[in-house]
Amino acid sequence: MPRQLSAAAALFASLAVILHDGSQMRAKAFPETRDYSQPTAAATVQDIKKPVQQPAKQAPHQTLAARFMDGHITFQTAATVKIPTTTPATTKNTATTSPITYTLVTTQATPNNSHTAPPVTEVTVGPSLAPYSLPPTITPPAHTTGTSSSTVSHTTGNTTQPSNQTTLPATLSIALHKSTTGQKPVQPTHAPGTTAAAHNTTRTAAPASTVPGPTLAPQPSSVKTGIYQVLNGSRLCIKAEMGIQLIVQDKESVFSPRRYFNIDPNATQASGNCGTRKSNLLLNFQGGFVNLTFTKDEESYYISEVGAYLTVSDPETIYQGIKHAVVMFQTAVGHSFKCVSEQSLQLSAHLQVKTTDVQLQAFDFEDDHFGNVDECSSDYTIVLPVIGAIVVGLCLMGMGVYKIRLRCQSSGYQRI
């Protein structure tokens, strides 16, 4: 019985000691519970380096602040945290013997736009034996974003954007449960001088060199004969040998003076189209063109359309005209047409075309030579008067000789 009483007394004594120690520990851990309704424990890097000995209500409230000094952005790194401590601890806290390493990694924006990585500030905080130390049993988040607004400088090109974010890596053994300040959105701004300038390039077109147009002659002159050909693949389609002259008049009057322009074969380019029933010959020269259209019937072909265009520079005047549904230089299929005499065609009231020394053929060529020649009727009209004049002259000469002879015979006889 005395042993049981002594054991009970020892038990009560130990319980009293335990309760006494627990009350002292709670008094030390939570000196003023009335101020813990909304506790805010914030510590800068400088405050974390040494143990916290002050009560929670006197803890300074600090945030991540940015200061502008001499045009550069400098950051005073601060981690603002809120530690819920409304629930009193019922367990016995023992001082940690191994040091707890808190690594706070911050990045600072460099003042210039460079491609180098931002400097990293790493702070190692020693162990704290204060009763208000953060519990090391909470797993940290991957990272938290800084609460202060940061300015991101955009540079042209593919460059990394330096962000003014406070990143807490996984090596940090504490968790920031709630931030005391709301996060502000990051507003990127373009740094002056880094954006690509828009160049308003004004291209001034070089003035085109004006080529002087054809000049007109007041009097007609001899026309050069040119040879113009149009090929259908490797076969000859149109072949023309002729001289062309354009005659212009400024007024629709017979008494209006005429001016003349001769087409130079050396400065003329021939082109055209070939068909089974219709082909055309286009002659391009400086200041204008002449177009001839050939039409083929069952047994003959002819020029069915003639058009011309001429631009004169001094004074600047345009003369143009076209004649449809004409029958000009008609001849048999497979033959060539020849006309030495001048042929004129009125295309408009101010433009007239004249050809001379013409020999041409379209369709049905044998080799590259002209076929049988069919001459124009105007050439015959020139020859016949000449032949008639020659015949009349010969007749007159014969009659004169006969008359003279009669006189001689009559003068040789006398009457007896």
Curated annotation (Swiss-Prot):
Lumenal-facing ranges: 28-381
UniProt GO cellular component terms: alveolar lamellar body membrane; cell surface; early endosome; early endosome membrane; intracellular membrane-bounded organelle; late endosome membrane; lysosomal membrane; perinuclear region of cytoplasm
UniProt keyword terms in alphabetical order: Adaptive immunity, Cytoplasmic vesicle, Disulfide bond, Endosome, Glycoprotein, Host-virus interaction, Immunity, Lysosome, Membrane, Signal, Transmembrane, Transmembrane helix
Keyword Glycoprotein: yes
Transmembrane segments: 382-402
Residues bearing glycans: N112, N158, N164, N200, N232, N266, N291
Disulphide bridges, residue numbers: C237-C274, C339-C376
Any Pfam family: Lamp2-like_luminal
Lipid bilayer topology: Single-pass type I membrane protein
Tissues in which the protein is found: Detected in tonsil interdigitating dendritic cells, in spleen, lymph node, Peyer's patches in the small instestine, in thymus medulla and in B-cells (at protein level). Expressed in lymphoid organs and dendritic cells. Expressed in lung. Up-regulated in carcinomas of the esophagus, colon, rectum, ureter, stomach, breast, fallopian tube, thyroid and parotid tissues.
InterPro entries per the UniProt record, alphabetical: Lamp2-like_luminal, Lysosome-assoc_membr_glycop
Complex and partners: Monomer. Interacts with FURIN. (Microbial infection) Interacts with mumps virus protein F; this interaction promotes protein F cleavage by FURIN.
The protein's name in its UniProt record: Lysosome-associated membrane glycoprotein 3
Organism from which the protein derives: Homo sapiens (Human)
